[in-house]
Curated annotation (Swiss-Prot):
Keywords: Autocatalytic cleavage, DNA damage, DNA repair, DNA replication, DNA-binding, Hydrolase, Repressor, SOS response, Transcription, Transcription regulation. PANTHER family: LEXA REPRESSOR (PTHR33516), LEXA REPRESSOR-RELATED (PTHR33516:SF2). Represses a number of genes involved in the response to DNA damage (SOS response), including recA and lexA. In the presence of single-stranded DNA, RecA interacts with LexA causing an autocatalytic cleavage which disrupts the DNA-binding part of LexA, leading to derepression of the SOS regulon and eventually DNA repair. Residues 41-61 bind DNA. This is LexA repressor. It is an enzyme of class 3 (hydrolase). It comes from Polaromonas sp. (strain JS666 / ATCC BAA-500). Belongs to the peptidase S24 family. Its EC number is 3.4.21.88. The keyword Transcription regulation applies. CDD domains: S24_LexA-like (cd06529). The active site is at S152, K189.
């Protein structure tokens, strides 16, 4: 089993999970690492062979009661790993495996606020402050944090005020959550490329898909590789 997905002993003092709960927690972490967003109840049910999404919901509620995750109402992807869960996962890795020292080092991530038109996203004037995290918390090491503004990605569990961990990239696969620059605006959306167009899809029915026509100013700034609740940093 990969050390990045072993939750069998979250912490010597943490909640004891059933085998099924461990499996669901692993699935959640894997989905966030792979796509930048947690799975839906239906996706959990399909992956684990449940007859309905209700069965997945029951297990999620149990994990929430144990304080391992937080459920956000009103969104199909409203599942968040709590800060103490992330910390316990890290402690578990340190305790059970001999990790290289560099994987335990602190990672300095600049927080990008509002981005001025025409300026590089990591220009000094955009950086509000720097946060430090254990690098082993991220399977793909991010380059910076972006403060989320608005609710267009609500159903992916990404809401206003969250901090999105972003890996700089100029290419993306369909379905990945990306940070993109369209003209003077920087936005977080799900990426889809068709034969002639690029579509940036919201995860909220109240918002419209952004269609980028050939020749329009467009630049991919990075891929979402993690999500941090702003309240975790208070």
């Amino acid at each position: 089993m990969s050390i990045l997905n072993d939750f069998s002993h979250l912490s010597s003092e943490g909640p004891k999970l059933t085998a099924r709960q461990q499996q669901i927690l692993e699935l959640i972490q894997s989905a966030i690492t792979r796509t930048g967003a947690p799975p839906t109840r239906a996706e959990i049910a399909n992956e684990l062979g449940f007859k309905s999404a209700n069965a997945a919901e029951e297990h999620l509620q149990a994990l929430a009661r144990k304080g391992v995750i937080e459920l956000v109402s009103g969104t199909s992807r409203g599942i968040r790993l709590r800060s103490d869960t992330l910390r316990s996962i890290h402690e578990s890795r340190v305790k059970q495996f001999s990790l290289p020292l560099q994987s335990l080092a602190q990672l300095a991530l600049p927080l990008v606020g509002r981005v001025a038109a025409g300026s590089p996203i990591l220009a000094q004037e955009h950086i509000e402050q720097t946060y430090y995290f254990e690098s082993s918390l991220f399977q793909r090491q991010p380059d910076y944090l972006l403060k989320v503004r608005g609710m267009s990605m609500r159903d992916a569990g990404i809401i206003d005020g969250d901090l999105l961990a972003v890996k700089q990239a100029k290419e993306a696969r369909n379905g990945q959550i990306v940070v993109a620059r369209i003209g003077d605006e920087v936005t977080v959306k799900r990426f889809r490329r068709t034969k002639h167009l690029i579509e940036l899809l919201p995860e909220n029915p109240d918002f419209k898909t952004i269609v980028v026509e050939p020749g329009e100013p467009f630049e991919l700034e990075g891929l979402a590789v993690g999500l941090i609740r702003n309240t975790m940093l208070i």
